[in-house]
Amino acid sequence: MASNASADVTTMTFERAIEELESIVKRLEDGKVPLEESVAIYERGETLKRRCEELLRQAEARVDKITTDANGAPVGTEPLDVR
């Protein structure tokens, strides 16, 4: 099974990784997957989850908040703190 199912997660886009992760969750929730396969796809799901988290962290680091002066004119950017 060295096809798309074993595609290298480290090169996946966020959208592709989340799509495959959602597919795995659905298969596991359906409960029709044999035990060994369930364990294997669960492990793949964990890898996909980590990839998605990594890509989200990278995206967060790129988001900037525009700063303005007293007159409201843009003067620069600073990291956006959304907490």
Curated annotation (Swiss-Prot):
GO cellular component: cytosol; exodeoxyribonuclease VII complex
Keywords, sorted A to Z: Cytoplasm, Exonuclease, Hydrolase, Nuclease
InterPro entries noted in UniProt: Exonuc_VII_S, Exonuc_VII_ssu_sf
GO MF annotation list: exodeoxyribonuclease VII activity
EC code: 3.1.11.6
Subcellular location: Cytoplasm
Enzymatic class: hydrolase
Reactions catalysed: Exonucleolytic cleavage in either 5'- to 3'- or 3'- to 5'-direction to yield nucleoside 5'-phosphates
GO biological process: DNA catabolic process
Location (main, coarse): cytoplasm
Superkingdom of the organism of origin: Bacteria
Quaternary state and interactors: Heterooligomer composed of large and small subunits.
Its biological purpose: Bidirectionally degrades single-stranded DNA into large acid-insoluble oligonucleotides, which are then degraded further into small acid-soluble oligonucleotides.
Similarity section: Belongs to the XseB family.
Cross-referenced PANTHER family: EXODEOXYRIBONUCLEASE 7 SMALL SUBUNIT
Name of this protein: Exodeoxyribonuclease 7 small subunit
Gene: xseB
